[in-house]
């Protein structure tokens, strides 16, 4: 039987149990405990588009806060930056980082490869600053050679890519449905089928 906890019980400053309801019947129960450990998963369902389980609604964070706990470093949420926002049938499905690793290009509504504008100074030495250099890296790596140039900015860390996409959307350069475009069509169907079969199957 599974329960959803709605509140923590306290005596003074000490947590002594919780109140929860059964997920199927909705019956309310109170539990007393000598100690309570919150292990409740993430908070991804706080965002309208995500690939996380429906359960990841931040309940554990809220329970702790309501009970008087101090929450720290709440801004440090790791996002996987690419997922589907349209059409509705695939909304929230993750698009693997392999798509970018195989040469996927992030563009905005104006057709610009905007990631070149978001390379942090600390990563500038490792990432290409021209389309030509970026494309050369892809050609070398996907053909099994050692790269002789810097990697594409689409392969920056997840936090940088997620913030860049969000910045483009907020600036009015996002897709019609609130995202960005990830294009790998230049690799051709045969290469996509070989290297990214699951992505092809999900989104063909």
Where is each model-derived feature located?
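A conserved short coil-to-beta-strand element within the FAD-binding core of flavoproteins
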Residues: 1-14
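Short, acidic, Ser/Thr-enriched surface-loop or helix-capping motifs
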Residues: 10, 23, 108-109
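Short, well-ordered coil/turn residues at beta-beta hairpins
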Residues: 33, 39-40, 109
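Flavin (primarily FAD) binding-site architecture
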Residues: 38-52
